[in-house]
């Protein structure tokens, strides 16, 4: 699929395809759509990042609040987005011991109490042990530092989800 295909998508098609690149934030995809034409996948990714960077802190916190707790109730209930479910499975968060699940639950609650948004990390770039260590460490960050760190993680997730979309296109086409 050439980049022209993405450029020629109408609003609904574009939001349908890219609406969860930023977890549960189709409005970001809607805003990015207005910046067509895209010259490359990298340019499209940059537009997602630029949109987020221009948000005030409250907007960035809103994006973070759309993310589920890692190994939380949405995973247990099966109500995660398909992307989040795959990411948490890949990180091993479905194979926690009782002690790990309890520890992660307590850390998630403490983190949310401190920062007022869930802990966000690119699960696909980490495993369950690293995620628990990062959560244990990052809970001590300043609110400003943690907001910036969490948004950087959202951008990593965005990058991988855009690559997933690219990898679903027919072979022999290019962006």
What are these regions (language model features)?
Residues 3-8, 20, 27-107, 157-175:
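Aromatic-anchored, charged helix-turn/loop surface patch used as a conserved interaction hotspot
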Residues 14:
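Surface-exposed, charge/polar-rich loops and edge strands
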Residues 96-100, 104-169:
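C-terminal non-catalytic interaction appendages of large macromolecular assemblies
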């Amino acid at each position: 699929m050439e980049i022209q295909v993405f450029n020629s998508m109408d609003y609904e098609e574009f939001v349908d395809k890219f609406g969860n690149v930023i977890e549960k934030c189709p409005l970001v995809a809607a805003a990015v759509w207005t910046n067509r034409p895209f010259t490359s996948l990298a340019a499209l990714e940059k537009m997602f990042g630029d949109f987020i960077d221009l948000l005030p802190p409250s907007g960035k916190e809103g994006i973070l609040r759309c993310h589920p707790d890692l190994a939380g109730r949405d995973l247990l209930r099966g109500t995660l987005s398909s992307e989040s479910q795959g990411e948490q499975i890949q990180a091993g968060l479905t194979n926690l011991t009782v002690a790990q699940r309890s520890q992660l639950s307590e850390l998630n609650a403490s983190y949310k109490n401190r920062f007022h948004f869930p802990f966000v990390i690119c699960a696909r770039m980490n495993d369950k042990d690293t995620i628990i260590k990062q959560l244990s460490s990052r809970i001590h960050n300043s609110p400003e530092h943690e907001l910036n760190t969490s948004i950087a993680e959202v951008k990593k997730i965005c990058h991988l989800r855009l690559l997933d979309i690219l990898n679903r296109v027919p072979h022999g086409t290019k962006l």
